[in-house]
């Protein structure tokens, strides 16, 4: 028993150490990019957060990364799809994780939504590493078809984190009017790419998220997605994974910039949750615009 406790403690310490090392790498890379491209970053607003705020964002991001690493076993849980309740008109909400992540990322956000009355929430898995975003989009389509069919719903809403937003966009673009997606809310999605791993060549998914990649060019070409679904992009000026952070801006969508939050911290933020809840509950579509500081689009 004592040996198992020691192994568990070593595992926890290893996850915490790995989380800290990854974030040191990411934040140093983001700072290096700011130094190399100061005019663009200043124009994009990435230097508006004072250094104490960035230091706090780093500490919270380390904690969020470690917490999600420890939550990995919970990703094995599966929620059964249920028919819609006649007295609840809201569509099912599908939660889509990002690169190298898992469905358990949404445990906190899903619990808050359940507490506020959402009954049909489904965190789905897709290929987290070593795959292809468009192939993941096809698998997502099969999952959404099953959710709509079993729930008896004509549409679903999607809340996607990081790369999950690109998977959702690829799916909606491929299916067009038949996608059945009413609203797409993305959190920290690199809509215009990210330069966090400029020299990493082992995983093709990372290459697909580089600025100017063939995939991003296809998604951006006469992008029909904002016309097919209500699109809201929530991104942080202090995101060290989406580099520069302004690449979280999604042309054609309603964009909300927040500050003082890292990439994974977006999933635990009360400010971000309030935006997600309000935008899921709102009835009319947002106009393409940008709201600074976290103001939701008007009802």
Predicted ranges, named:
Residues 31, 69, 105-106, 133, ...:
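Short, function-defining helix-loop hinge/capping sites that tune catalysis or transport
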Residues 63, 137-141, 269-277:
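Short, amphipathic alpha-helical "lid/cap" segments that border enzyme active or binding sites
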Residues 1-93, 107, 116, 295-299:
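Flexible, membrane-associating and regulatory peripheral segments of lipid-active enzymes
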Residues 34, 108-109, 136, 199, ...:
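Single-residue recognition of alpha-helix boundary sites
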Residues 94-104, 110-225, 241:
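Serine-dependent carboxylesterase/thioesterase catalytic core
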Residues 173-299:
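Helical cap/lid subdomain of alpha/beta-hydrolase-fold lipid enzymes
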